[in-house]
Amino acid sequence: MENISALHAVKEELTYLNQMFPLSEFVDHFDTFADGSFPSHWHNEFELQIMLKGNAEYRVNGTRYMVSEGSAIYIAPEAVHMMKALSSNAIGYNVVLLPQFLTNLFQVSNCEKYAAPLTSRHPEAFVITPERKEGHAV
């Protein structure tokens, strides 16, 4: 797996079907990527990828995360990241959302503190597993 460098990472520009709801979602079939990996990139959105099948290794700002089937990874806005399948036929469901959308939504309902963990750049990433009982502190 390559060493992540912000100098070599490409900014991924995502498009939205509806500008009022800036969300993109797609299914990643890792076998369709060269060598089963998606190269270093970053974007303004935060990302949540759920492993539907198989296992994958993620590198986020140089830190390694292992994500297994049934688990997910949260990646903060502007974090440089890449992913590589660790098993054949690995599939992930991916959702990316502009943090400003959540900030605006929660401001309207006076719940800004709930948006803070998803709109900040720290933590850069964390893995969510079915066994994990605790939530993220607000």
What are these regions (language model features)?
Residues M1-M66, A72, E112, P123:
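Generic protein-terminus/edge-of-domain signal
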Residues E2-S24, V80-V138:
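A hydrophobic/aromatic-rich effector-binding and dimerization subdomain
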Residues W42-N44, P77, I91:
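Exposed loop/turn and edge beta-strand positions of beta-sandwich/beta-sheet ligand-binding modules
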Residues S68-E69, K84:
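Short amphipathic alpha-helical leader/targeting segments
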